[in-house]
Amino acid sequence: MSEEKIKVSELAKEFPAVPNKDMLRALRELGASAKSMAGSLTTEEAARVREHFAEQKQADAERSGSHPNVIVRRRRKDADKADAPEVTEAAPAAREEVAPPAEEKPAAVEAPAQAEPVAEAPAASPHKVEEKAAPEAAKAEPAEKAKSSKARVVSAARVISRPGEEEEKKPEPVVESKPEPVAEISPVAAALAAREAAARAEEKSSEKGEEKGAKAARLARPDASAMPEGSSAPTLPQRAPEARTEAWKDADASAAADAAPRRAPRADGGQAPSAAPQVRIISRPAPGSQPDRSTRPAGGRPGAPGGPRGDSAGRPPRPGGPRPSGPGGPRPAGGPRPGGFGQQPAAPASPTDTRDGQSKKKRLKGRRTVDFQQGDFGGRRDDDDSQRLNRGKGRRKGGKPTSSQATQPLKAAKRKIRVTEAIRVADMAHQMGLKANEIIKVLFGLGVMATINQALDFDTATLVASEFGYEVEKAGFSEDDYLTPKEVDAPETLKPRPPVVTIMGHVDHGKTSLLDAIRKSNVTSGEAGGITQHIGAYHVKTKRGEIVFLDTPGHEAFTAMRARGAQVTDLVILVVAADDGVMEQTREAINHARAAGVPIMVAVNKMDKPSADPDRVLRELAELGLQAEEWGGDTIVAKVAAKTRMGLDDLLEMVALQSEIMELKANPDKAAKGHIVEAKLDKGRGPVATVLIQEGTLRQGDSFVCGPFSGRVRALMNDQGKKVKEAGPSLPVEVQGFEGVPEAGEEFFVVSDEKLARRIADSRAIKQRERELASESRVTLETFLSQRKSDQETLTLNLVLKSDVQGSLEAITEALLKQSTDKVRINVVHGGTGAITESDILLASASQAIIIGFNVRPTAKIKDVAEHENVDIRFYEIIYKLVDDIKSAMAGLLAPVQREVYLGQAEVRDTFSVPKIGLIAGSYVADGKIARNAGVRLLRDGVVVYTGKISSLKRFKDDAREVVKGNECGVGLENFNDVKIGDIIEAFETVEEAATL
């Protein structure tokens, strides 16, 4: 052929009505080289494709003319006489086979050899073809005319499968007796055609084998073509049975009697059984389905054109003969016929998938289609059998009925749906067994624009459910179901645990110093002003066992901290200074311990001082109800001196003895539960909380819930700053992984998974928000006027508080709010933990507030923003100084006081050790200046690490009085060597000036 090529996509434009899928299938059948729409074809291949679709188009036109109301899924052989010329053209190639196939299908003009019984005489096949192709003509004309027309059709022999195979193989008596009921076909015409076909079938009984060969060929070629030249198997799919009409059913009834005799002869012949199944196959609509039907042996198919059939002349009863005239006109192509009902196993080679795909699309359109798999063929089975087959067919083919059946039982089974506070449309549809778009339609009717992810409240869900006959149950979420233990721990699961001892007492009475002496550490020196302002938890190993100590602040502002310490402890050690006696916070600590029901031990500290008076202390304690043992009471009293370590062993001995009496036990093999001792926001690690485990074991990776926050344990660190994998009962650990900074004192629960933790946390957040909204007083005219009147008379001092830890923030807030008077009111606009940020500056500027920083410092950039916004920032490290300043400012009594003046900042870029001097910080002055006589602070991540003085300041090797911005210098700090690269050294000086507050 010529070298010219044409693209498949260009060729497809010549056939706009042909889908790409059909075009590619035709290319495969014709053996074209192109495999996709982007491929190219030779001119010869293109001509073959055009001829193929031209024949198909003509066949479709003829079929649609005779049955306009029927939709055919595959091309079929024309039953009209007009087809005869086409058939004759194709006949030469297929004629050798044609004769046998034609005989096989006297009534069902099925070309495939499998469906056709043995038919040696070619003339017989033409008659058979005519019978199918021209059923209308048969009705109007005598049987003779019908026969002659059949002869013409036979020559067309499109249906004929492989000609070679049919001749070689002896045709079995099996004749495709496809009694395709056509409404138009009259029983008489069908009977005449069937008789003639039967006679011919007898003559061709020897060609039974050909039928089988044709069947195989048909399986191999799923598509039914208009007998392309050189095609050995009929490619036309048979669809005759699908379009049944009432007339066809009548014909079936009349054919039943004749069919029985025909079947009997077949049984004698032995070939009949195979022929019978083939006849049934005729109904097969799709090429893929054809193989399936052929496979299934339909013993009752006796209607085949086989010799034995001829005697029965029952062909007429089966309307299959005239089939062509009916909607099954195209059906005459016997190709599909070989396939039995869907019941038969489909041949692997059959292209059922393609057929099914087409039929599904057409069915979805709700249009009338020809069902080739329908079970009752005229004269083939009795009415009951056909009805049963039809029912099965409907189930297989009807996608819509099946889906409705699947939904209905679900509706009937559940008439209630469960809804919490809200439910998504998708979840509601799932519970009701409906599609989401049905619910969305109802919502649109109610004026609600919703999507499948839209959440509906309980009332809306009730309205929607009522539209579908459902009731709504409110399924409230109760966290107690998950957090409250359902079973009491068995005695054998309980194991001894260390006691938790809280040290309480008045400020500066030596609580932390006593703990330092026990731990052999030096915590006090690192505390601002030498007082404790955080609650600390420490795990100590002593000669008498392990003890966990909680060190609480003694300042009056830390009432809430002391109360928390008493709640989570087993034993309270009340520290009283021998020289001071019982003070205000001592009494408060006693009340906290009694409220928590915790036993109290007394440690009389500072016994090494000359002014110590232990008897006075015992007398004052007795007045409060704490009678010492030596005075005849039951309160254990130990006399100690923290600095000289006097009496510490006796104190620990008493603690161990008391814990043994209490028999402290816990179950370590359960989900952990504990309390938040302290919480803060760390710049590098995020929200961090110190948790005291009370029962169970906390492990890395556990999901937990704490207040309105949930999280997952990312890391655990003990009181010494070392990472640990797990923590058991009575052990304090620092936990990373919170979503936010929890409130100190909150309960900490480990739950099964992160999803549950988040659900509980969200539920708590919603309830907390509802409580806040409910607590807001309703605004009335009276309350508004009274508020305005009071506002005019009262001055308000707005403050923004930033602290290093949550507990300190809480204490400062309470202490400041207590200072409010009728004339001056304190209003804390915002409080948080961590370094001062730009958003804090902007908030203070908008609310005309003063920023109070407690143990936190701003960076140089933040200072610039504050100056630009004219916001005053005050920094404090000791709470009572902060409270005193606020008091003085409120009272307007602030005479000239000392005030810090910021000098500059230097960034530590390197560190090196110098003998006899210590660690020197090689620094770069980033802002202002560093003066030799100035005070300095060492900032690490915005938090104050050290406050003191400069011991040495050098530039290169020379001492310097000051170093200005942009220069490098070496800075040595007094009594401090823990300087790290990246730290900030801030210089300041103290001056006296009038208070601006």
Swiss-Prot record:
First-listed, main subcellular location of the protein, grouped into a coarse class: cytoplasm
Sequence segments annotated as region (G1): 505-512
Stretch list, region G3: 551-554
SUPFAM superfamilies from the UniProt entry: Initiation factor IF2/eIF5b, domain 3, P-loop containing nucleoside triphosphate hydrolases, Translation proteins
Annotated Pro residues bias: 316-335
Keyword Chloroplast found: no
Chain positions covered by the region annotation G5: 641-643
Residue ranges, compositional bias (Gly residues): 300-309
Single GO molecular function: translation initiation factor activity
Record GO cellular component, one term: cytosol
Low complexity bias locations: 108-126, 151-162, 182-196
Residue span of region Disordered: 36-415
Stretches with biased composition (Basic and acidic residues): 45-65, 94-107, 127-147, 163-181, 197-214, 241-252, 378-388
Annotated keywords: Cytoplasm, GTP-binding, Initiation factor, Nucleotide-binding, Protein biosynthesis
Subcellular location as annotated: Cytoplasm
Biased composition (Basic residues): 390-399
Residues at which GTP binds: 505-512, 551-555, 605-608
Its job: One of the essential components for the initiation of protein synthesis. Protects formylmethionyl-tRNA from spontaneous hydrolysis and promotes its binding to the 30S ribosomal subunits. Also involved in the hydrolysis of GTP during the formation of the 70S ribosomal complex.
UniProt family annotation: Belongs to the TRAFAC class translation factor GTPase superfamily. Classic translation factor GTPase family. IF-2 subfamily.
Protein's name according to its UniProt entry: Translation initiation factor IF-2
Lineage, broadest ranks: Bacteria, Pseudomonadati, Thermodesulfobacteriota, Desulfovibrionia, Desulfovibrionales
The encoding gene: infB
